[in-house]
Amino acid sequence: MLTMGGLDVESVEPVAPAFDKIVVGRVLEVAKHPNADRLTLCKVDVGGGTTLAIVCGAPNVVAGMKAPVAMVGARLPDMEIKQVKVRGVESSGMLCSAKDLGLSQDHSGLLALPAEAQLGADVRRVLDLDDQLITLKLTPNRGDCLSLLGIAREVSILTGSPLAVPAVAPAKAALEEKRGILLQDTAACPRYCGRIIRGVDAKARTPDWMVRRLERCGLRSISAIVDIANFVMLELGQPLHAFDNRAIEGEVIVRRAREGERLKLINGQEVELAPDVLLIADRKKPLALGGVMGGEASAVSGSTVDVFLEAAWFNPSAVAGRARRFALSSDAAFRFERGVDFAATPEAIERATQLILDVCGGAAGPISEAVATLPQRKPVRLRSSRASKIIGVQFSDEQIAGLLKRLQLPHARSGGEFTVIPPSYRFDLEIEEDMVEEIARLHGYDNIPSRPPQAKFTMLPAAEGRRTLSELKRILVDREYFEVVNFSFVEAQWERDFCGNAEPIALENPIAAQLDVMRSSLMGSLVANLRFNLARKLDRVRVFEAARCFLRSSGGEDPRDPARALAGYHQPLRIGGLAYGPAAAEQWGVPVRPVDFYDVKGDVEALLFPREARFAPLAHPGLHPGRAASVSLGGAAIGWLGELHPRWQRKYDLPQAPVLFELDVAGLAAVNMPQYREISKFPPVIRDRSMEFDEGIPVSGILEELARNRPPLVQNIRLFDFYRGKGVERGKKSLAFRVVMQDTARTLTDAEADAAMAQLTELLAAKFGAKLRT
């Protein structure tokens, strides 16, 4: 039930293992064993006029004490009791320790039972051992369930049973004395209650029932006053603290710590405080870490006569993280970090006062209270239609109203809309989805039908004029590249070295000290991949990555561009690759040579095919000054390729320079649509022409000019030879072009072919000053 209600039950265990025939007995006489120094002979009254002779080895056995007696035939967790002789003396049973009963690991002596326990009564009933210990694994937002009251409230909600909260009558003030309270930090502590109780017996014995309940909740008994404070915390969820009233000088002050201030805590640890730590102090000194742990100097002890009892509400933000900073763990901090009911503070101090007066005696004064601005619970809107849509179950307005009533949430209704005022103990109810969750868990998660979502999908035809990222990746994989996936954050030094980026986009909270900036290029990550593989003895590496890079926006981007996802920043999707080592995998039929610029240029051209890119010399901080090129399509730059700069090759300990490229995916996606062209049935005419050009004229510019201004008969022009040397002037180069001419209607004559070649020669001479080489 609790698990399905949202409170995860981690385990349900009995508080004691199974055993029977264990009764309450009183030790009447204790005599020395005749044959053993460490054993005693005990006469034990087990009620009903029955007296047993039992041999016992416990050091704490004394006449008059009451202890558990295992009768002959009793079954304990580890043994069965029989009538036996112990060193020649008959023993009719066994006096038991807590370990014998499986209640704890304490085997130092007999388990002493309360003096009022009835002789012969079943120990399971006397110690309330037929109980179950339920361990809950609460989520951080359910701090309201860190108490018996909170769990009882949930059970009431889930079952519909009425919640019976024991009434706590205000203690009648037998004193007029009050201690002043000053709140210097009202945001961190807007409510503080305190009460003086004089004449307490600090050495009073904690009731057995309270000790048992504390132990079952994982708390050890310390002293009656401290035990009562802990018990009320478990019962109502409000942490309390008891000060020795004599240790407080003047009024109680809630303030921030001063730089360098120190406090010794009740666990013996001395801590140095910082100004963001909340303190409970008096006029002269700190007394406690607010909401975390008390100080040793002001703690109650066996000599305490007067107590100042504290109950306060601390803002979770003022307590969160403070215990961890000092390596502390306290139940109070655990609760205050998650949120405590700020309306229940007076009730908690009244309950603790009642128990202290009952157990320790004394006289209570009136409650001193300082209250500033308490948290205001903002109304939360809940629509029936919204709840039905999210949960997948149709709820009527009346059903929603009924569920809110069971949840004990005050609300106002207007049609199908409810305005809910979250109670003071529910800090987790802030938005409409929180309320929908409450409706769902109360309705029952197992009552929500399993309905797979249904949607109509229409397959859209793939655009012929665009390629997907998967297609681009497949091209590189076919060319022996392996895909890698790297972090988008890199070392700042990589950005400075490879990109010349002196001010990369810095991360506020990097996952590692060295990964502190966002990358503006894939280059650094690919070089890191290369070094990783070289360290593992690979001599041929081909890797690529398709990912976003991060740049500061220049302001000229299209606001509809998906790469401009955040104002002020540009996040283009790029594909980059790196090639290193032999151009081809080693095999007997191919000479071994290192990969070069032109090998990777071929890979880039394969990515762009059937479109033709323009490659132009490029100065790039990460690339070799003479072996780098920009890549343009349709007059727009889309990336670069080149060999790594020798400086970075040496710095990053690379035996040879890799060749890299990086292209914008947006520029690669578009492809030319195929155009129909009639296939000629007439033979082509093929002519070669060799021309001399100035050394500085790029071949790409020549080919582009020929493509733009070729005669209609020319179908294709291709460079097939390049020559420098004998017969060519210094500062000149010889380029040989193969020209294919063809007509779809007739066979070309030599005169027509000669005229077309002459036209091309004149074009090159006029545009580039080229001379026909004879």
What are these regions, as identified by a protein language model?
Residues 1-175, 308, 324-327, 331, ...:
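Phosphate-backbone binding interfaces of nucleic-acid-interacting proteins
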Residues 90-100, 106-112, 123-125, 132, ...:
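Mobile "lid/hinge" segments at catalytic clefts and subdomain interfaces of large enzymes
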Residues 159, 163-261, 354:
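Glycine/proline-enriched, intrinsically flexible loops and inter-domain linkers
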Residues 150, 380-541, 687, 740-744, ...:
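Extended, well-folded interaction surfaces typified by the phenylalanyl-tRNA synthetase beta subunit core
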Residues 155-184, 360-387, 393-394, 435:
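Terminal amphipathic helices with adjacent charged low-complexity linkers/tails
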Residues 389, 406-412, 419, 428, ...:
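A carboxyl-terminal module marker
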Residues 81, 253-293, 297-300, 447, ...:
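Class II aminoacyl-tRNA synthetase-like tRNA-binding/catalytic domains
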Residues 10, 26-53, 211-212, 229-297:
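Conserved mixed alpha/beta core segments that line enzyme active sites in large multi-domain catalysts
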